[in-house]
């Protein structure tokens, strides 16, 4: 395996601390996507975002100043 591959089972906390304050994409188990600035993530993967946009079926549905996403709904977090 190459260095840094996901199969190594690395702790994601270093990655998450690096991208705090940066634009991210958060996809939920339901397929809804949130894009915004990552403000914080806790050990349960609860996520706080600022300047958040909600996309449903690829289309912008709503914009929020701040949004909180409960961790058990999160499929993935991606740095933009």
UniProtKB/Swiss-Prot annotation:
| Subcellular localization, as worded in the UniProt entry | Cytoplasm; Nucleus
InterPro entries membership: Lsm6/sSmF (IPR016487), LSM_dom_sf (IPR010920), Sm (IPR047575), Sm_dom_euk/arc (IPR001163)
Q: Which CDD domains match?
A: LSm6
A Pfam family recorded for this sequence: LSM
Top-rank taxon of the source lineage equals Eukaryota
Q: Which GO terms describe its molecular function?
A: RNA binding
Q: Which residues form the Sm domain?
A: 11-80
- What is an annotated GO biological process for this record, any one? maturation of SSU-rRNA
Cleaved signal peptide residues: none
Q: List GO terms (cellular component aspect).
A: nucleolus; P-body; sno(s)RNA-containing ribonucleoprotein complex; spliceosomal complex; U4/U6 x U5 tri-snRNP complex; U6 snRNP
Q: Which keywords describe this protein according to UniProt?
A: Cytoplasm, mRNA processing, mRNA splicing, Nucleus, Ribonucleoprotein, RNA-binding, rRNA processing, Spliceosome, tRNA processing
> Which family, according to the similarity comment?
Belongs to the snRNP Sm proteins family. SmF/LSm6 subfamily.
Known partners and oligomeric status: Component of the heptameric LSM1-LSM7 complex, which consists of LSM1, LSM2, LSM3, LSM4, LSM5, LSM6 and LSM7. Component of the heptameric LSM2-LSM8 complex, which consists of LSM2, LSM3, LSM4, LSM5, LSM6, LSM7 and LSM8. The LSm subunits form a seven-membered ring structure with a doughnut shape.
**Per its UniProt record, what PANTHER family does this chain match?**
SMALL NUCLEAR RIBONUCLEOPROTEIN F SNRNP-F, U6 SNRNA-ASSOCIATED SM-LIKE PROTEIN LSM6
> What is the role of the protein in this entry?
Component of LSm protein complexes, which are involved in RNA processing and may function in a chaperone-like manner, facilitating the efficient association of RNA processing factors with their substrates. Component of the cytoplasmic LSM1-LSM7 complex, which is thought to be involved in mRNA degradation by activating the decapping step in the 5'-to-3' mRNA decay pathway. Component of the nuclear LSM2-LSM8 complex, which is involved in splicing of nuclear mRNAs.
Any idea what this protein is called?
U6 snRNA-associated Sm-like protein LSm6
User: Which species is this UniProt entry from?
Assistant: Ajellomyces capsulatus (strain NAm1 / WU24) (Darling's disease fungus)
What is the taxonomic lineage of the source species? Eukaryota, Fungi, Dikarya, Ascomycota, Pezizomycotina
